[in-house]
Regions:
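N-terminal beta-alpha lobe that positions the nucleotide/phosphoryl donor
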Residues: 1-156
Length: 157
């Protein structure tokens, strides 16, 4: 059973996670940048810790600082929310390697789903329906040749 979860996010998603923690009897730890001081998610937390630094890279994306705060506050788990560090396989692995519980997809799943082509192949292999598409390495004529089988409107990337 989890006892204390650090929420590595801010705003509405942090509020939702902190409320869910409270309902489950889990203490919630919020991290916040200086400009988020006094906002609702910091008020909902059992513990709120201000991040050092300016800007996202030094605060909400600073993996080492966030892990250190979790450890110093006796957290047993980290919930990333979405965005920010939730899509970073290296952060998920660092959380696991530090002995904490990562509340999210495995680092392997994050890696597979982070690359669109790998995600598409993985989903097809798992029998999940995917939107028709083609990987085209040729020129305009190849695009024109496969376009009818893909369907319109056609998005090129």
């Amino acid at each position: 059973m989890l006892k204390r979860t650090l929420v590595a996010n801010r705003g509405e998603i942090a509020c939702r996670i902190l409320r869910a923690c409270r309902e489950a009897g889990i203490e919630g730890v919020a991290i916040f940048a200086g400009n988020d001081s006094g906002t609702l998610f910091t008020e909902l937390a059992d513990i709120a810790v201000e991040l050092e630094g300016d800007g996202l890279a030094e605060t909400y994306l600073n993996q080492e600082q966030i892990l250190q705060i979790a450890i110093e506050n006796d957290c047993d788990s980290i919930h990333p929310g979405f965005g920010f560090l939730s899509e970073r396989a290296d952060f998920a692995q660092a959380v696991i390697d530090s002995g904490l519980i990562w509340i999210g997809p495995s680092p392997e799943a994050i890696t597979k789903m982070g690359d669109k082509m790998t995600a598409r192949i993985t989903m097809k292999e798992a029998g999940v329906p995917v939107i028709p598409g083609e990987e085209v390495d040729g020129g305009l004529q190849e695009v024109l040749d496969v376009a009818p089988s893909v369907g319109y409107p056609l998005l090129l990337k």
